[in-house]
């Protein structure tokens, strides 16, 4: 049976990737259908009840800058907010929020149900409709066919998912949800290269059985209270609560070692590779054998539940071992587990076989986003989902894809890393992955991406108005700083001397003062109304802090940012220099066999991508350029 209506875009999956994909496509005016096996679980935080962190917070800000939902939903559901790396430079500062699971799901569902052009349907998708090498639609478990111009697949850990607790295992996409076995088999039939990965989650603990009096309290930031969205305000936050810190000990480690003979990871039952940067407690004990303690964060799961998430003891050990290891931790001696920890193994598909639009090369009109591409984390999934939704929508409208560059966004870094290098383990974003991170800060994601989002039809009138007011205010305040001069004989020179700790030797403007070490924008504005009489910083919109941060950072780091801009411009040539799709690299004279094999395997689309493949040297790129300029790189089809 075929559904009576055809769609522009169908999104399969209602997790963080799927919800952002569906919202993006619908905001662009595409008739969009989101199919999920459970409407109640739309936007569910399946593992850690938190959003953001180093690199991850940058992605959330970028999603928000383009009108996405994750940041705004977090502001409505966050029960603790912190700025990580607050004492370090602006490039690596990152927002993190502890979330209330119930409030977050409600915030996401509300946005989905009230988004024009977006329909929801509850069903499991078992099959894809493919004609030739183009996707036509999907088929649900009950045999109902939905037709669409484009399909975005965001299946998370559900593709042939298998849950492990000790040596027991069973099919499942996550605890309580079925695996997508038929859909995974169908994708394998289409000859899409795949592999297996693994992730895990810790046991959940009844907070009434935790002794917090012997733990270290970890409160959120209070002055100021952070927000995630550029349109967010602290007043939107629900009640704020602390997290708590404890540690494992030698007894804990002995218990874990004693259970390794029943660990699915250490007995070969699990074949999938787990995340390097979020290892299980078994992995920590094995890899860091010399350490006698590991930090554990007790994180509340919400305001209306007693459950706590013990961040740091993800495990797939048998339940009896989990019980013992939890009770060996200080403050958890009487703890009661309400949900056991487990590992989940699932299929992913090699992202090197995707285009930068996240469309599969093998099947036209089919887009992949999220853990299906080998990533880990809500934020990485949401960023890919938004990009896939954008490009599916653009393709449905007959328009060119939007391909974010590494130099303009962490989204661009994420996608380029996946497609150029592939994954051997679940991919997690860090600021260290971005070579231009000083230009890709949390504070300026809107300056980088909101205008692009507006052009794509993603940014509504209100967000655009707020952005324009902020942009104008930053420009106006920066100009004002340049226009105000202070000299050794100026009436407020003594105040400047006190501020600097030394006398002024020559006349300078306020931007020069602000560039001095230890001098802040706040200190400059406090010099006195006689030289500084700023207009309102749009505090009616809650923008004052954003504007002052932008002004201070852009002034203090101007020289570094300008040098980075020159470097970016220099790299643009390689980045956009196209490589013929059918180029046989074994015919390029002078390239080593290793480089030839890697280039033929990865099939980079541009010279810039080729240069980021491990083992491809600048000398190899020069040989490739010579080859192309001689015309030898043209394929039969392009001649």
UniProtKB/Swiss-Prot annotation:
Cellular compartments per GO CC: cytosol
InterPro entries xrefs: FAD/NAD-bd_sf, GIDA_C_N, MnmG, MnmG-rel, MnmG-rel_CS, MnmG_C, MnmG_C_subdom, MnmG_C_subdom_sf
Domain of life: Bacteria
Locations listed in the record: Cytoplasm
Protein role: NAD-binding protein involved in the addition of a carboxymethylaminomethyl (cmnm) group at the wobble position (U34) of certain tRNAs, forming tRNA-cmnm(5)s(2)U34.
NCBIfam families in alphabetical order: mnmG_gidA
Name of the protein: tRNA uridine 5-carboxymethylaminomethyl modification enzyme MnmG
UniProt source species: Polynucleobacter asymbioticus (strain DSM 18221 / CIP 109841 / QLW-P1DMWA-1) (Polynucleobacter necessarius subsp. asymbioticus)
Primary gene name: mnmG
